[in-house]
């Protein structure tokens, strides 16, 4: 059986078979583990043939039914820093049969890759796609690619982040603003360009204090943008600060909230993994939204890992 494969010692082909559920009986959590192992090869191997093979195998999962898995696949491809992934991401963005959350993640990943050849496509979908989540994601990706290739980027004084992720926007320069209160105002000012609000968000993340976390939590309250709120929940999963747990639980429990926000809140609770997170996550295993149910499964696997002897 495929599930008996040791994912940490598996070949690329074995990882592909686990990821794509070739046997038909692989647990979702194990498919995610296979994905992250393939990502390590795609992002870190010096053998370009291996890198391209890992990326090709990862992209096979775009044929899957799982919205959660495909969205994570798109995210991972954006983190490989390899433009070989761009062809797959463009195809997903253009495919209206893919779920909005998957297409959004593909657009964001093109921004993470800094793919200048995708600018025209991103601009087209920014102007013409009916989904606000796709429009806003393309707006951010366009701004990120332009920023990355600008003189401004070379001149900015950015602190080295504790986090290795390639984010939808760079943090605000450390010499531009360092007061939490002012960053919070930029974060929550809906008249500011979304890119600047994201820059404030990632500056607050990198500050990482309880005060900064609570400032970020204020962005979950009344903002109309599901995209914006889902990014805050994602950032909380990186920070793993228990002070954010009440805001995440409130978000997860709010059935009026978009599934893309609630699912990210669930995964963040799995990463934080305090005792109060466990019963909350268990209570969402039968949620009305499939992506929230799947996220609860993955989050509980993360919770078990964080509280085990594996780390």
From Swiss-Prot:
Its main location: cytoplasm. Its cofactor is Fe(2+). Binds 2 Fe(2+) ions per subunit. One of its GO terms (cellular component) is cytoplasm. Keywords: Cytoplasm, Hypusine biosynthesis, Iron, Metal-binding, Monooxygenase, Nucleus, Oxidoreductase, Repeat. It is found in: Cytoplasm; Nucleus. It catalyses: [eIF5A protein]-deoxyhypusine + AH2 + O2 = [eIF5A protein]-hypusine + A + H2O. Catalyzes the hydroxylation of the N(6)-(4-aminobutyl)-L-lysine intermediate to form hypusine, an essential post-translational modification only found in mature eIF-5A factor. This is Deoxyhypusine hydroxylase. It comes from Debaryomyces hansenii (strain ATCC 36239 / CBS 767 / BCRC 21394 / JCM 1990 / NBRC 0083 / IGC 2968) (Yeast).
